Each structure stands twice: as structure tokens, then as C-alpha cells.
């Protein structure tokens, strides 16, 4: 098992933090383009320094806590949400050998850590002692259950085809053909389920502004609010990295050409992650928010039966034709 040294840890975490900052800027730019606006363009050339200005503004703001809140849990919740998104990055391979830790249960570790994110949201809503924050937290917990089960069944389908739970071995198994080609319907369900799990549009019911006034983080200000948003966007990058490892082959080049092999694998991995992040933003710009009953019905009545129905035929085909890895 490969264990990273502190320098390598900083080499991956610092780009992640910068990526989160500029992902917010990219989302604002894309949303502005879709709505025929300019977007942020005042701070720096083309607004490139806008994330720095927003960060300084949040740091300099006075942190205000509700007088009736549970202060220890209230302060701990956004930190826990952000730290979980960082810890989960440990098993995502950026290139051959470029991974913080490469255990044989990497995919299960990632699934377990991502499932813990809901606790930070529940604690934030409950400790705020606000009915709007608590309503947003309850919505998040309720919508996580059916989609978590669907995600688990989809991952089982991929594991059966690959024969390994190691993240790097899953990428290496896609040298001949991307798993996203034969398992395309499964991976579409996986991406949509990840939208619901990360509370992104059109499934952002926990923070529906018109109903629950920004949801579980309505009482947060200053760095508490900043850490909540950092955790959300870090989870977007994490899930895009996971989708890249599972479907479009991870770090190998898109085309098997001599000139493509000269480009580092980490660059190819980053390009594929950026494409998934653009898909996140495009979905937010293009689709309206689901009603809560539609969200729950999609998870329980559509995705759960379909993901369960895919495990059996895929297993049967692999056993019948002796294609088990």
C-alpha cells in the first residue's frame, strides 16, 4: 500500500483549494453566459481575482452565532463537512502512482466517507435551533437514503465488471475499453444520483431559497458560511474525479496517439474532471428544481429498481460467457 509524504499531500490539497475557488468563478461565468449577462468582471482581468476578493470579504466579516444555538456543534459542523471532502480525496488517483493512499478497498472507503457528509448537514441544521435550518437538514437526510442505496448498487455493478475495489486498478482495467461504454445507462444514473447526494441543482431541495431560506446554513456567516460552500464545491470536484475514474478511463489519454502520450496523465485527468464539472454547471443552468415528491419518487421508484435490475443481468452475462475478471 502506498502512503504519501506531507509534501505530496500539500501538492494535491492546495490545487484542490484553488480549484474550488475558481470553480465558483467558472460557475458564475457560465451562468451569466447562459442568462446573457457578463458576470463578475471588475476585480482583476476578466474577473479572475473575484474569488480572492470574495474570500477576503468572508474572512473579514464578523462571525455571528444565534443566541439559542449549540455553539460547539454549530462551529464544528461546517469544519466537519469540509474536512470530509478533503479526506475522501486520499484514494482518487490523478495519474499512475499519483495518489495519496492506494488501499485495496479504496472505492468502499470513498463510498463510506461520502456517506458521512450528511451528518455535518444534520448537525448544522439541528445546532442552529432554527426551523428553516432544521427543515433543510431533514430534507437532506431524507433524500440521501434512496440515492445512497442506488449508488451502492451501481458501484457493485462496476466492481463485478472490473474485479477490484482498488481505485488505480479500476482505471487500469479500462485500457481496452472505457466502462462508460458498456455501462452507459448505469453511469448516467450514477451521475444523477451524485447530483442528488451533493445537493446540486435540480436536486438542491435542502437549500431551496423560496421555501427554507437557504436551508441548513441559513444561520451561518463569515468563515462558517465559507466552509459550507467550500465543502459543497470540493464535493463536486471529488465526485467529478470519481466519475472520471469509473467511466472515461481516468488518467490515460482520450485517443491512443503518440502525441497524446507525451501529455502527463494528470493533465488528461484534469481535462476529464473539468468536463464533468461543466456538466454540473450546465445542469444547474438548464433544468428547473424538482418538487420534493418528484425527487423522492425518482430515487425510490425509478433509480432503486433500475440499479437493482442491472446487477443481475450484468452478473449473468459475465458468468455465462466466462468473462469474470
UniProtKB/Swiss-Prot annotation:
GO biological process: aerobic respiration
Bilayer-spanning residue ranges: 5-25, 79-99, 105-125, 144-164, 177-197, 237-257, 263-283, 302-322
Enzymatic reactions: a ubiquinone + NADH + 5 H(+)(in) = a ubiquinol + NAD(+) + 4 H(+)(out)
GO cellular component, one term: mitochondrial inner membrane
E.C. no: 7.1.1.2
Keywords: Electron transport, Membrane, Mitochondrion, Mitochondrion inner membrane, NAD, Respiratory chain, Translocase, Transmembrane, Transmembrane helix, Transport, Ubiquinone
Main location: mitochondrion
Disulfide bridge map: none
Gene Ontology MF terms in the entry: NADH dehydrogenase (ubiquinone) activity
Its membrane topology: Multi-pass membrane protein
Keyword Translocase: yes
Location in the cell: Mitochondrion inner membrane
Enzyme class: translocase
Function field: Core subunit of the mitochondrial membrane respiratory chain NADH dehydrogenase (Complex I) that is believed to belong to the minimal assembly required for catalysis. Complex I functions in the transfer of electrons from NADH to the respiratory chain. The immediate electron acceptor for the enzyme is believed to be ubiquinone.
Family of this protein: Belongs to the complex I subunit 1 family.
Protein name: NADH-ubiquinone oxidoreductase chain 1
